[in-house]
């Protein structure tokens, strides 16, 4: 997520496709959409909107919308009254959404926020990922922190290190937490960086940080998902979806979508959901069965 763009674009973009891309219904349910999450049991895409343009104030005007697998709008305000919600994940019938108050635990069937899990001293809580046992991990981009929430528990600070380099997108991969970084800030609280971000891995047992792919800089990274042995990341600044091969080779999958944020993935259907923050759109990209 990038928080300092002033305006939203409304122009319909021509989209490059890989196996076919489809725009969700051109209705007004989205306002600065930040995250798309696929929930297989309900066969739904959930998309968070900051609300109020790029505002990240605790103003209660953010919401989550629900779309079908094909991208049809089902509920424009599935849950509302939120404070600039960003990253999302799900586990055990619950949707977990990060907003300015902390992590919201939402009962999916009841469409009701059950509790808010406070993130102590968080600066800009952003993305969230879940392990198989239900443990949650939350990135704090400006704070260079990652929080951990054990099932049924409160949040604790897990890793705090400048080596996290503006942690943004998170993805659990076996015994490690993969981190897509924005890049090292030139100064505290600045979005300007000394270089673009890269990919890291944090060991789930002891929290040690490993720089991946020989430390190559990739971009000002936002979202991160994995499929098979391939990673997909978004570069917010360039509006680009990138594929990262197991060798570290980076290739462009799609370009021209300003403010590409926290993507989601339907691994069974091999479909990626892309929220375009500056264009107020959800883009569904079918990777096809033969994507490398």
What are these regions (language model features)?
Residues 102-103, 108-133, 139:
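Asp-box/WD-like beta-propeller blade repeats and closely related beta-sheet repeat scaffolds
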Residues 67-71, 107-112, 149-154, 203-207, ...:
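Short loop/turn segments that connect beta-strands within beta-propeller blades
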Residues 10-18:
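Bacterial N-terminal signal peptides
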Residues 60-65, 102-104, 145-148, 198-200, ...:
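A short loop-to-beta-strand structural motif that recurs across blades of beta-propeller domains
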Residues 50-52, 100, 141, 182-184, ...:
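Short loop/turn segments immediately following the C-termini of beta-strands
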Residues 1-11:
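Bacterial N-terminal signal peptides that target proteins for export
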Residues 25-27, 72-79, 112-118, 154-160, ...:
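A short beta-strand motif characteristic of beta-propeller blades
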Residues 29-43, 50-55, 60-61, 79-95, ...:
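Beta-rich, blade/repeat-based domains predominating
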């Amino acid at each position: 997520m990038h928080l300092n763009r002033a305006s939203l674009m409304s122009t319909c973009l021509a989209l490059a496709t890989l196996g076919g891309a489809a725009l969700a219904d051109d209705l007004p349910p989205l306002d600065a959409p930040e995250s798309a999450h696929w929930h297989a049991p309900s066969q739904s895409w959930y998309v968070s909107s900051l609300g109020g343009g790029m505002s990240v104030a605790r103003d209660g005007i953010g919401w989550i919308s629900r779309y079908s697998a094909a991208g049809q709008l089902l509920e424009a305000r599935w849950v509302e009254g939120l404070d600039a919600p960003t990253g999302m994940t799900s586990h055990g019938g619950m949707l977990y959404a990060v907003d300015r108050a902390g992590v919201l635990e939402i009962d999916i069937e009841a469409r009701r926020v059950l509790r808010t899990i406070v993130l102590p001293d968080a600066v800009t809580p952003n993305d969230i990922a879940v392990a198989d046992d239900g443990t949650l991990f939350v990135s704090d981009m400006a704070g260079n922190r990652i929080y951990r929430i054990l099932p049924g528990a409160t949040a604790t600070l897990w890793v705090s290190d400048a080596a996290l380099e503006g942690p943004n997108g998170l993805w659990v991969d076996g015994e490690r937490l993969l981190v897509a970084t924005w890049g090292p800030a030139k100064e505290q609280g600045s979005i300007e960086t000394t270089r673009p971000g890269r990919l890291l891995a944090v060991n789930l047992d002891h929290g040690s940080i490993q720089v991946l792919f020989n430390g190559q800089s990739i971009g000002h990274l936002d979202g991160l998902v994995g499929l098979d042995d391939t990673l997909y990341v978004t570069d917010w600044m360039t509006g680009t979806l990138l594929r990262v091969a197991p060798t570290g080779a980076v290739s462009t999958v799609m370009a021209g979508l300003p403010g590409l944020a926290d993507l989601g993935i339907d691994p069974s259907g091999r479909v990626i959901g892309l929220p375009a923050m500056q264009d107020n759109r959800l883009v569904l990209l079918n990777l096809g069965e033969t994507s490398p």
